[in-house]
Amino acid sequence: MEKNRTNIFSVYLMITFLLISIFITMVMSDGEATIINAPNRCPPGHVVVKGRCRIAG
């Protein structure tokens, strides 16, 4: 009986760690997506070409 209780506890522990890691991954990827989608700000007279500021003309 004691071994069965230990196995059930370890299964609950693994599920808990899995859910926590999924939650952390979702939060981190959401933050990275916000950073990636931020618009580039170039000085006046410059345009964005392939993610870099270039002189317009």
Swiss-Prot record:
Residues 1-29 form the signal peptide. The keyword Electron transport does not apply. Disulfide bonds join 42-53. Residues 30-33 form a propeptide. The modification Alanine amide is found at residue 56. Keywords: Amidation, Disulfide bond, Glycoprotein, Hemostasis impairing toxin, Secreted, Signal, Toxin. Coiled coil: none annotated. GO terms for cellular component: extracellular region. O-glycosylated. Expressed by the venom gland. It is found in: Secreted. The keyword Secreted applies. Serine protease inhibitor which exhibits antifibrinolytic, antielastolytic and antimicrobial activities. Displays antimicrobial activity against bacteria and fungi. Likely functions in the innate immune response to microbial infection and possibly in the venom, as an antifibrinolytic agent. Belongs to the secapin family. This is U17-myrmicitoxin-Tb1a.
